[in-house]
């Protein structure tokens, strides 16, 4: 990743922290990934040679930029879903400033509804939104996963009660290896071997 992009991401990271510290309404907070988590998500996407990634929860595009920079130049594409129009506006502006908009397909709407309309296959999925809806969304995505897909979810340690249904579901899936990595707020990493 080139220096200018790292500088821009650092600015977004700092803006996100300052914004969230002042914003009293939870739904208006940006809730960006921690830098270490974003770096790990990027490394995993590159290592998987992901070509078709799905991000659930775009926010202002911070993690979306990490994903697009990781897989876009090698032919990958990121579909990212956000339900807040205000956040999606930022999510369109920020990747454009980073020169990565061409690798993105930004969708506005309820993620569960949007997922129903999306064709597969996906070889990389990143859940970073409403944790209580994640099990239903994963259920919709299972038939749309590639045979060796990576499925990630943030907040696995910071919000254990809210993400418990998702973690239980992933742990119960045959042909999935799963681990929670203690980085940032906890990153759930599941590898599907659906041969």
Where are these regions (language model features)?
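A short alpha-helical cap/connector motif
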Residues: 1-124, 131-152, 156-195
